[in-house]
Amino acid sequence: MKKNFGKKAASVMAVAALSLSLVACGNGGSTEAASEAADASAGTASTAVTTSNNSGSENSQKPLVWFNRQPSNSSTGELDMGALTYNDKTYYVGFDANQGADLQGEMVLDYIKANADTIDRNGDGVIGYVLAIGDIGHNDSIARTRGVRKALGTGVEKDGGVDSTPAETNTDGSASVVQDATLEVDGKTYKIRELASHEMKNSAGATWDAATAGNTIGTWTASFGDQIDVVVSNNDGMGMAMFNAWSKENKVPTFGYDANSDAVAAIADGYSGTISQHADVQAYLTLRVLRNALDGVDIDTGIGTADAAGNVLKEGEDYRYDAETRSYYALNLAVTADNYQDFTDATKPYAPVANQLDASTSPSKKVWLDIYNAGDNFLSATYQPLLENYDDLMNLDVEYIGGDGQTESNITNRLGNPSQYDAFAINMVKTDNAASYTSILNQ
């Protein structure tokens, strides 16, 4: 709540400082390679991964929401239905990753078409792009890599989908995981080539690493900088690192994902575009499903059906719901030079659902909520501030826990007494590890 903002901020800063020291001595990354994975919006419903059995304990019956990382097998994409249906008050909140990935790919393609006469910097007839991959085992990263390759025609089929494997260096076009494509604009034919792509993982094992992306663009440009016409990134953290390190000065179009505040502001300085995950809707849904479960009202209250305060979202425009997997997905929006001024404050609550709930019908309740990596730009600088605004509006006393981005135990060790909380919101380090949390609730 607002009176606790200072305390919350201090707590987060302390956790962030701790996480930095832990990253330096961490033992390994938090992901595994994925040969084929479904996206976070529509993973393959399957009972192949059902490690989160409910014991019937008091804590196991409390409201639970998984958010941002959908319980699933990181190698196959199969959803962990045991975790998603842990009890009758369990839900998942994320965003439609396939829709957003396709939107990013189309945004890049549209830009190339509109600027084909000037985008080929060295005039060799090849429009070359580089791609920063966040995490080869993360469904969202996989979807975004596929979305770009599908839109640009550089994707190669593998196991019924577009191969998302990093091409590494491919300046000669010989890589097997991608292919050269052709694009005709105004009677002229161009070749499109993925010059290089790489998973941005640091030496401590943390993925989606902005510093690694900044260093990598330096390596790429030193070797083949004159061939790079477009820079694409799985997220804005890495995209902005490459933009600031090289492409801003060289006026090379750069595209990211997340609509982080710094990235949106950078559009005025040449950052070409990003995708809004509708984080304001995601954060609202994360707490709203808990609030509804705690109040014992219909889960659609304040979501698809207006509540007494007038809060309501538009299904099909703001979000979609998949009943089988009990999953809510926010819908994405493209942010470009044409509309970026509408997205300059990424931490502002979404106006249609920014009305205060009545404390007499929605009394104060205590919620335990973790952010898997206190150093993650999107989650810590955008998502958590939104949550902190919404928790006031929903009369929820939320304890925010920041992880190190590497180990589940760094988070679960701080859930020592679940009985003191009324509900739980969980953001895992690895999508495979739902049982690390439910085993505690089962006690």
Where in the sequence are the language-model features?
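Bacterial Sec-type N-terminal signal peptides, specifically the leucine/valine-rich hydrophobic h-region
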Residues: 19-22
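Short acidic (Asp/Glu) patches
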Residues: 16
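Bacterial Sec-dependent N-terminal signal peptides
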Residues: 1-13
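A residue-level marker of the well-folded mature domains of exported/periplasmic proteins
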Residues: 2-5, 25-443
